Amino acid sequence: MIIDCHTHLSFPGYEIRSEDHFVAAEPLDACFVLASPDQPSRQSNQLVSEYVARHPKKMLGFAIVNPVIDDISVRYWSGIKDTGFVGAVLYCGSEGFHPTHSKALQFYEVADRLHLPLFFHTVPPFGPDSVLEYIRPFLLDEIAQKFKNIKIIIGSMGLPFVNEAIYMVARHENVFGDLTVHPQKVWEVYNTVLAAHEAGVLGKLFFGSGLPVQKPQSCIETLLGFNKLLADTNLPTVPREKIREIIERPTLEILGITH
């Protein structure tokens, strides 16, 4: 199975019609649809919920939460889970809250109780109220230690703090990396994959496209093909079968998501 762990229906600066999102996801067996911070959380979650309900066999929703201002009660999040959401996505940097804020820690207790995996989204665009420091993967260390049963995904390998993300993935059994691929940034992809391979954590990375920013098919082709670009160089390569394993990883099983 091919699971895309990183897609959106909308994102600041990008939009895609739901029917176009579904067409772009054709090469995939399933994909995560992350609610976006470009509108209030309830509206964004409603948009994703309606889309997921139309395609329950393929689309899996991650509800956005800003624990500082949103409802983080068990009752509310039990209801969220009942509407087709399988996890939560947090935009600590762009929404300006520390990942270990006291309200955030309260939310993690709820997520732990409801068995919700957490996706920490890291990439720009960042607005004037964003705090770049809050996307640093090292800040998740306390969370991963305290809530060992929560599966944590570091979005986009923690860019621009990739090395921190790799250390976190290596350090914690319950922490994983989202390898969102940029076909126009092959060198960036190469360095990230090679660093993860050399650190022995390639087996804990999940494939992501970042749709609508990139199309899944282009991302798959980029991953499978970048070794060819290095054929006439002396640069180290990563075994093709290891790269294919990223694309075909049983992400749902690893995260404990029933689908």
State the predicted function of each range.
Residues 43-131, 175:
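Active-site gating/metal-coordination segments in enzymes
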Residues 16-21, 42-50, 71-75, 137-139, ...:
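Alpha-helical scaffolding within the catalytic cores
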Residues 6, 48, 52, 80, ...:
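Conserved, mostly hydrophobic/aromatic
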Residues 7-9, 34-36, 63-67, 89-92, ...:
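A cross-domain feature marking catalytic cores of carbohydrate-active enzymes
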Residues 3-7, 12, 19-41, 58-66, ...:
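Divalent metal-dependent hydrolysis catalytic cores, especially in the metallo-beta-lactamase
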Residues 86-87, 100-207:
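Catalytic pocket-lining loop regions of alpha/beta-barrel enzymes
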Residues 9-16, 36-43, 65-72, 95-102, ...:
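Acidic-and-aromatic substrate-binding clefts and catalytic sites of carbohydrate-active enzymes
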Residues 1-8, 16-30, 199-204, 218-259:
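Mid-to-C-terminal alpha-helical segments outside catalytic/metal-binding sites
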